[in-house]
Swiss-Prot record:
Gene3D superfamilies: Vaccinia Virus protein VP39, YhiQ-like domain. PANTHER family: RIBOSOMAL RNA SMALL SUBUNIT METHYLTRANSFERASE J. Pfam families: SAM_MT (PF04445). This is Ribosomal RNA small subunit methyltransferase J. The gene is rsmJ. S-adenosyl-L-methionine binds at residues 101-102, 117-118, 153-154, 171. Keywords: Cytoplasm, Methyltransferase, rRNA processing, S-adenosyl-L-methionine, Transferase. Specifically methylates the guanosine in position 1516 of 16S rRNA. It comes from Klebsiella pneumoniae (strain 342).
Length: 250
């Protein structure tokens, strides 16, 4: 995949070459999308819109730390949707990991989560965020046990991932109507990088084959059900719903 690679660390130690080799990236200095190595983290920038700033994964500080400490925990809609109850903490495959926010919420309440991400740039951002998270004194211990990244296409990985999870979670990219600054910023950068999720409908059937208990699909409230398969079971929040489908028992 071609992208502009920039090293702002000043170290000059060939880190970009290592990054490119690991994730199959090719330097393209004219590309509007840039993957930038800063002294703090790896971030994605849209070079023709510098005001958008960089997008990076941070499980330790910022919004994720606030959500972990002051969010709803087990009361969060995503936790309810996957079926967390009492001692039951399902094993989850998040087949559309993105920046890992929902996966992190599930891991923080005790679920083991395997994140699938096919886009090499997004996978590199997730991997960078995980490395910093794993090294953190406060959350590193449980994060290493509960949150892992698999760089693979969901369409192929969903048919051969082992062991089978109890829950498969899907949050395919869908055009956002909301005008919130954060959504606009992230969606603009993300959609410039990965484009629309044209094959998302094809994920539902293999996800239902893989999950032993249920498949949860996050949708904006105005979006039709995935693959046009309606379900009466959903956890509904302001602006979103989590459609729930039966899996395939072992």
């Amino acid at each position: 995949m071609k992208i502009c690679l920039i090293d702002e660390t000043g170290a000059g130690d060939g880190a970009l070459s290592v990054l490119a080799a690991r994730w199959g990236l090719e330097q393209d200095e004219d590309n509007l999308m840039a993957l930038v190595l800063t002294t703090e983290h790896l971030e994605l920038r849209k070079r023709d819109e510098p005001k958008l700033g960089g997008i990076f994964v941070d499980f330790v500080g910022g919004a994720m730390a606030h959500r972990r400490k002051f969010g709803g925990g087990r009361g969060e809609a995503v936790a309810k949707a996957v079926g967390i109850k009492g001692d039951y903490l399902p094993d989850v495959v998040d087949a559309t990991a993105g920046l890992g926010r929902d996966a992190f919420v599930l891991a923080s309440v005790g679920c083991r989560v395997r994140m699938l991400e096919r886009n090499p740039v997004v996978a590199a951002l997730l991997d960078d965020g995980l490395a910093r998270g794993y090294a953190d004194a406060e959350i590193g211990g449980w994060l290493q046990e509960r949150l892992q990244l698999i760089h693979a296409s969901s369409l192929t990985a969903l048919t051969d991932i082992t062991p089978r999870p109890q829950v498969v979670y899907l949050d395919p990219m869908f055009p956002h109507k909301q005008k919130s600054a954060l959504v606009k910023k992230e969606m603009r950068v993300f959609q410039s990088l990965v484009g629309p999720d044209l094959d998302a409908d094809g994920l539902l059937a293999p996800a239902r084959q893989l999950a032993t208990k249920r498949v949860v699909v996050k949708r904006p409230d105005y979006a039709p059900p995935l693959a046009e398969v309606a379900t009466p079971n959903a956890v509904v929040t302001k602006g979103h719903r989590f459609d729930i489908y039966a899996g395939t028992p072992e």
